[in-house]
Amino acid sequence: MEYRIEHDSMGEVKVPADKYWAAQTQRSSQNFPIGVGLETMPREITHAFGILKKAAAMANHSLKPEKMTDEKLAAISQACDEVMSGSLNAHFPLVVWQTGSGTQSNMNANEVIANRGNEIAGKKLLHPNDDVNMSQSSNDTFPTAMHISAVIAIEDKVLPAIDKLVATFKRLETENEGIVKSGRTHLQDATPIAFSQEISGWRSTLERDKEMLQAALPFLKTLALGGTAVGTGLNTPKGFDVAVAKAVSEITGKEFRTAENKFHALTSKDELVFAHGALKALAADMMKIANDVRWLASGPRDGLGEIFIPENEPGSSIMPGKVNPTQCEAVTMVAVQVMGNDVAVGMAASQGNFELNVFMPVCMYNFLQSARLLAEAIVSFNDHCACGIRANKEKMHHNLHNSLMLVTALNPYIGYENAAKTAKKAYKENISLKEACVSLGFLTAERFDEVFHPEQMV
């Protein structure tokens, strides 16, 4: 491998000749060989750095054009566009397990953008610190990258995934109107419910999850940029924080604003805890929905068997013909991972000692993993399972009319205690509710038929 010599305040460092990073990134690679190749800083963070570095250059150009010249702005902007597009991903090697402020990742961005910008300009035009990092500190850039990436992940990935599954459930509601089945509570038979009503519960659950995520977004759309080292805004021109938030909004097409209190923005990660709580709620609800589906699909002969789900692949290496609810299992495993991530996010957020949180990389690594896994799992569940759900009408009808909980319909006519006696007799003697009720003398056969209509109990 060919190398070039880079230097920083600590001296010279050998850097791979074909990489845009420089001394500080190289030192981090050497000092933190933890999870290399497996737990790289999330690409969402890298791309967010591209956004905020371009925005900072735009703000600096408008506020102090004598330092951020047209030529420098053009070079930085083009390099940042390449960072945002992902075409420079290979030049961002650092792992999550580094300094808790994300300083090395900030410098990785500064070095790559400066060296690529110099290549674009055809001369030594940009300095990583003096130009690319102008009016910034790692302490306000990394929190800003966290919020930008979180907003993009939720708005562009998670919410569209929810919308897709909601649309499927709406279609299933319409298709299954008029089908009545046994309801179940405590995993025991309960009074009847329309299958469309059961599906509407799933749909409404997801709609509420979407509302909770949307409620978290305004908090995430506040940016720390402009606070610099400890929140005082040292070395920033007046109005930089407002200008840079406006520039981020222009670049992303999303409405960001500067944080009202930069001291809070640097040291507290409560907005991310709140937002991840909404992701955890979504995970819990997806766990419930997936479990409902696999219970209803259990069988085919010895389970509930009330719905059919798509047969996507062989289910067993030893039992021929077995088909398992694999999409449901994938969703539930994702839900477990998200619930574990919530603990990590909360613990990391609690480590904001004095003026700076120093658990930011691990906080965001888990947050973004949760958002990504949920979005992808929901789409997969929708496309490979939910879209193909079909009611087993015969099994639903059989289970409904075999349920002892239909006796609840008799309460107004024979009273609770007599209804309980009817159900117990029917169960003990393995006879129908009608036979039990008539034999106990509570109703005549004709009267029973007049008042007992399971399909009307919904």
PLM segments and residue spans:
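Conserved, well-structured ligand/cofactor-binding cores
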Residues: 1-458
